[in-house]
From Swiss-Prot:
Residues 111-188, 368-400 are annotated as: Disordered. InterPro entries: B3_DNA-bd, DNA-bd_pseudobarrel_sf, REM16-like. PANTHER family: B3 DOMAIN-CONTAINING PROTEIN OS03G0620500, B3 DOMAIN-CONTAINING PROTEIN OS11G0197600-RELATED. The keyword DNA-binding applies. One of its GO terms (cellular component) is nucleus. It is found in: Nucleus. This is B3 domain-containing protein Os03g0620500. It comes from the Eukaryota. It comes from Oryza sativa subsp. japonica (Rice). Gene3D superfamilies: DNA-binding pseudobarrel domain (2.40.330.10). One of its GO terms (molecular function) is DNA binding. Residues 26-119, 231-331, 441-542 bind DNA.
Length: 545
């Protein structure tokens, strides 16, 4: 790039303008926004040294117009992270991947400001270093933030980060060091296996289905681990040999496991019993292995190949190393046969049919006295990874509802969901009585939906979501018939264009006393006063006749 040398000199001069040699502490730092930067940003530990290694729980970022962005500070993987609220700040300033931010601590004002540059172009000093600082309430001071552009390829902005004590700025070398040695700007860090959302680390070769990912996300929210969870899929060598062992990923073991070979303590979630496998570190420091009584842990808890073990580590005090293990069982698509359920309705190719033990079709006389033909009922199947055991659903064409076909209004169910004859009749009856102008989504409550296994998650499938639900995170109002009560539920996108209910869904479940095998009919309604809303019709499993 022409003039790159002179522009880089301006960049260095910008940093040197804030030099404070009194204590040699980092007074500013530089960050280049990498993948997933919009979710979080890490503050270098050296920058925190000037505040005694600590910073307040929240920081405020203030714009030139006086808009204040409150950002939560949290600890993950021994890193201090700007998280909740950071995304709003990023959006407001139109920060993009590969933009660079220079954060500085402003002398005598307890402020930290930053300069943004597009595509790592040098900073325009003249438009990014003037003192535009303000006093803020609460005893902390911040710099204002502004953005502008002087060319098609560069953009400058003054950003802010909270500081809790006085001080001044940094040298150009410090800014450069913070960019190179602590360049992680998001949870990608150095290892691509570290999840974009904080809370867990996947071992190499571990791939989560959407259902497992949702359960894992909910587990992280429930226990809020101080140390990221370690998630690994069981292989044959881990569970099927008298000499079974488990290798812990090196980057994780080095960071969180003991630094010497020793016996550790494992607990099974929900049990008081303890197991004491040996944690062994090879002399060449390339292998970190659980063995010995590891096989006892596997056998006593019936851990199988394909299961996913989640290690929740406790803070290591140097003497006893402890971890609690949660398990996600390998899920296999159900095969409904004569030994379990002799007669069920299945969704196939957009039609419903009755599945018998010999897999024969039945005539309409075998259903509701000949008043209905199951093979022509207008029910569409829907890919719903949360309901589908293996987390996979086939891609489907856009739905075409034709209310003239069959005896009921159209509705959607999860792909591979199986309704008993009793369930099918009850759903048909309720859908017919609702007379909805809009689509209805049918979901049979399982343990994860109603909190039986400690989780409260529910997913609406892809086809329903992409056709009828807005993109992005939304606040949804859930209503029930006859109560007049409303619940505000957060709905966020999942992989594969599905949608998941998060905050607020637990309250809905508890207030309505939902149980496994209850059926919920989600009716999308037009309610301008409440915005996006659904009326939920509940069919109790113990009330079906």
């Amino acid at each position: 790039m022409a003039g790159q040398g002179s522009q880089m000199k301006k960049y260095c001069d910008c940093c040197k303008r804030y030099v404070d040699h009194s204590n040699g502490k980092m007074k500013c730092f530089h960050r280049q926004m990498s993948a997933n930067f919009e979710h979080s940003m890490i503050i270098p530990n050296k920058f925190l040294d000037q505040f005694g290694g600590k910073i307040s729980r929240t920081v405020e970022l203030e714009s030139p117009k006086g808009n204040v962005y409150v950002v939560k500070v949290s600890k993950h993987m021994n890193k201090t992270v700007l998280q909740c609220g950071w995304e709003a700040f990023v959006d407001a300033h139109q920060i993009e991947e590969n933009d660079s931010l220079l954060f500085r601590h402003i002398k005598n004002s307890r402020r930290a400001s930053g300069v943004q540059e597009r595509n790592a172009d040098p900073i325009d000093v003249s438009s990014s270093t003037h003192d535009d600082t303000v006093q803020s309430s609460g005893g902390e001071r911040f710099a204002r933030s502004e953005s502008g552009s002087d060319s098609q390829h560069s953009k400058t902005a003054k950003l802010a980060a909270t500081c809790s004590s006085g001080g001044s700025e940094c040298t150009g070398e410090e800014a450069k060091e913070s960019s190179s040695s602590e360049h992680e700007s998001s949870y990608d860090l150095v290892d691509p296996q570290i999840a974009p959302m904080p809370g867990y680390v996947l071992s190499r070769g571990t791939n989560l289905s959407q259902a497992h990912e949702e359960k894992l996300d909910m587990l992280v929210q429930e226990i809020r681990p101080e140390i990221p969870l370690y998630v690994t899929t069981m292989k044959h060598s881990n569970v099927n040999s008298h000499h079974a062992s488990l290798v812990i990923a090196k980057h994780y073991a080095c960071a969180y496991f003991p630094h010497t070979s020793q016996t550790i303590t494992l607990k099974w979630h929900g049990k008081n019993r303890k197991w004491h496998p040996k944690f062994y570190i090879r002399k060449d420091q390339v292998g970190y292995i659980l063995h010995g009584r590891w096989i006892d842990f596997v056998r006593h808890n019936h851990v199988k190949e394909g299961d996913i073990c989640i290690f929740h580590l406790k803070n290591f005090n140097g003497r006893k190393f402890r971890a609690t293990v949660h398990l996600l069982r390998e899920t296999i698509p159900h095969s409904f046969g004569a030994l379990h359920i002799p007669k069920r309705f299945e969704s196939r190719n957009g039609r419903m049919r009755l599945k018998m033990t010999d897999d024969r079709r039945v005539s309409s006389t075998e259903c509701r006295r000949g008043t209905m033909e199951p093979s022509t009922t207008n029910v569409k199947k829907e890919a719903d990874n949360e309901q589908c055991n293996n987390g996979q659903g086939k891609r489907q064409e856009p739905l075409n509802f034709d209310v003239s076909v069959g005896s009921s209004k159209p509705y959607l169910t999860a792909d591979r969901v199986s309704l008993t004859e009793e369930q099918f009749m009850k759903v048909e009856e309720n859908v017919h009585s609702i007379q909805s102008e809009g689509p209805i989504y049918v979901s049979i409550m399982n343990k994860s939906n109603v909190g039986t296994d400690g989780l409260y998650i529910i997913t609406l499938g892809r086809q329903f979501a992409i056709r009828y639900l807005p993109e992005g995170e939304q606040t949804l109002t859930l209503l029930t018939t006859g109560t007049g009560k409303a619940w505000q539920v957060k709905m966020r996108p999942r992989s594969g264009d599905a949608r998941m209910f998060t905050l607020g869904w637990r309250d809905f479940v508890r207030d309505n006393r939902l149980q496994t095998e209850d059926i919920c009919l989600f009716q999308l309604t037009k309610n301008s006063e409440r915005g996006l809303a659904m009326k939920v019709h509940i069919i109790r499993h113990n009330e079906r006749s």
